[in-house]
Amino acid sequence: MKTLLLTLVVVTIVCLDLGYTRKCLNTPLPLIYTTCPIGQDKCVKMTIKKLPSKYDVIRGCTDICPKSSADVVVVCCDTNKCNK
């Protein structure tokens, strides 16, 4: 019986995804997020200036933080749900 239990524990550990995956917001709402694909371990928030008083905000996962420009402000971070 103990052998069977030990075998089940080992199989469970092997079958679980023990790798770390980042969780990033993909909307302004804090309860809605996405689990990032393997290799994308940063969260990003891009604010895109459309008109003098209108902005689009894009949130999600990335592997490399894009550079900001005159019309796009990029903020990257390395913790879960940090791209508020």
From Swiss-Prot:
Keyword set, alphabetical order: Cardiotoxin, Disulfide bond, G-protein coupled receptor impairing toxin, Secreted, Signal, Toxin
InterPro entries linked to this entry: Cytotoxin_Cobra, Snake_3FTx, Snake_toxin-like_sf, Snake_toxin_con_site, Toxin_cobra-type
Any one Pfam family match given in the protein's UniProt record, by short name: Toxin_cobra-type
Signal peptide, first to last residue: 1-21
Tissue: Expressed by the venom gland.
Disulphide-bonded residues: C24-C43, C36-C61, C65-C76, C77-C82
One cellular component term from this protein's GO annotations in UniProt: extracellular region
Any GO MF annotation of the entry: toxin activity
Cell location: Secreted
Function, as annotated: Acts as a beta-blocker by binding to beta-1 and beta-2 adrenergic receptors (ADRB1 and ADRB2). It dose-dependently decreases the heart rate (bradycardia), whereas conventional cardiotoxins increases it. At 100 mg/kg, intraperitoneal injection into mice provokes labored breathing, impaired locomotion, lack of response to external stimuli, and death (after 30 minutes).
Miscellaneous section: Negative results: does not affect blood coagulation and does not show significant hemolytic activity.
Family, as annotated: Belongs to the three-finger toxin family. Short-chain subfamily. Aminergic toxin sub-subfamily.
Protein name according to UniProt: Beta-cardiotoxin CTX21
